[in-house]
């Protein structure tokens, strides 16, 4: 759990503050032209960036829960629903889902859930008449599966991969908002170069989009690994 907290929550929060730190460095360094003449451009930029980077890194570190909440609100819930009925873990166990596991795998998991926790997944026939109940039953079962596989070392990396992407996107919401405000200030002529900020903003959006595109696939990889850890206690290799 300590590794998850570090790699899936702290690191993405800190990394999401990198571009705002660079833009802030550009603005402040433009005010210190005399410093650049004395130290040289590269050295002065480093001298300005280091303390700024530390400050923004600290902001990301302490705001990581806010970033996590934002990632759920803006990305996870729209994709998978707040009640988790559209999560990859649910889709893989639904008979009617195109992305479902093999019939044999679903039956194996269903049997084990009934034996371990008394949770009975709906049959293929019953699912057709009550899809919502089938989804909610799966969600209940998945919650139990997560509890018993929490310390599985092979599953941890898949969990970190998904958590990193999701939580980075939460930080990207705040950093993008910050860059939009800075761009507005630049255009007003108060401080900084609006072209530099615009480039940084576009790069931030493209980077966040690239991470967002991988979020669903990371979710399915984690879901398959979760079920494999539950029924076989081995690394996902389907």
Which residues does each predicted region cover?
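Extracellular/periplasmic helix-loop-helix junctions in multi-pass membrane proteins
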Residues: 187-201, 217, 221
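Cytosolic/matrix-facing juxtamembrane and C-terminal tails of multi-pass cellular membrane proteins
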Residues: 1-11, 209-238
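Single-pass alpha-helical transmembrane signal-anchor segments
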Residues: 201-210
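Charge-rich cytosolic interhelical loops and cytosolic tails of multi-pass membrane proteins
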Residues: 73-152
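N-terminal first transmembrane alpha-helix
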Residues: 1-101, 197-199, 215
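Transmembrane alpha-helical segments and their cytosolic interface motifs
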Residues: 3-19, 142-192
């Amino acid at each position: 759990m300590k590794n998850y907290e570090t790699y899936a929550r702290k690191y993405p929060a800190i990394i999401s503050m990198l571009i705002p730190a660079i833009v802030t460095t550009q603005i402040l360094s433009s005010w210190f032209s005399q410093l650049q003449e004395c130290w040289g451009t590269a050295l002065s930029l480093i001298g300005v960036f280091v303390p700024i980077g530390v400050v923004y890194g600290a902001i990301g570190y302490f705001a990581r829960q806010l970033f996590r909440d934002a990632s759920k609100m803006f990305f996870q819930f729209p994709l998978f629903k707040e009640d988790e009925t559209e999560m990859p873990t649910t889709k893989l166990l639904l008979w009617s889902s195109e992305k479902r596991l093999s019939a044999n795998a679903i039956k194996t998991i269903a049997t084990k859930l009934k034996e371990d926790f008394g949770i009975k997944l709906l049959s293929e026939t019953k699912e057709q008449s009550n899809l919502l109940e089938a989804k909610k039953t799966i969600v209940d079962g998945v919650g139990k599966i997560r509890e018993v596989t929490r310390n599985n070392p092979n599953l941890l990396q898949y969990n970190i991969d998904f958590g990193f992407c999701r939580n980075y996107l939460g930080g990207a919401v705040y950093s993008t908002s910050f860059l939009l405000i800075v761009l507005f200030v630049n255009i007003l002529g108060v401080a900084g170069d609006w072209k530099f900020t615009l480039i940084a903003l576009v790069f931030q959006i493209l980077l966040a989009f690239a991470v967002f595109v991988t979020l669903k696939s990371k979710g399915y990889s984690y879901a398959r690994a979760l079920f494999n850890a539950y029924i076989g206690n081995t690394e996902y290799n389907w």
